[in-house]
């Protein structure tokens, strides 16, 4: 065991907080206007019908309705919110 800290150990000991990214509301879930659907870096998932996009690329619902994930083209996905007809 070393009796001095050493040069490396005093420079360590930092860690950043998790960013808590990802899908917050899944397909088939009912959402109200303003609910966050996805937090993301970049546009991995595009905004579809009745979905807004924030300045940090967060996707959120513009209306009350049901979430649906759809294909944008072969590679990309989009998320839409459709009004419920109950």
Swiss-Prot record:
Coiled coil: none
Gene3D superfamilies membership: 2.40.50.100
InterPro entries associated with the record: Ribosomal_bL27, Ribosomal_bL27_CS
Keyword Ribonucleoprotein applies: yes
Bias kind Polar residues: ranges: 7-19
GO MF entry, a single one: structural constituent of ribosome
UniProt cross-references to PROSITE patterns, sorted A to Z: RIBOSOMAL_L27
Locations listed in the record: Plastid, Chloroplast
Cellular component terms per the entry's GO annotation: chloroplast; cytosolic large ribosomal subunit
Keyword Phosphoprotein on entry: no
One GO biological process term: translation
Region listing for Disordered, in residue ranges: 1-20
Keywords tagged on the record: Chloroplast, Plastid, Ribonucleoprotein, Ribosomal protein
Family: Belongs to the bacterial ribosomal protein bL27 family.
Protein name listed in UniProt: Large ribosomal subunit protein bL27c
Gene symbol of the encoding locus: rpl27
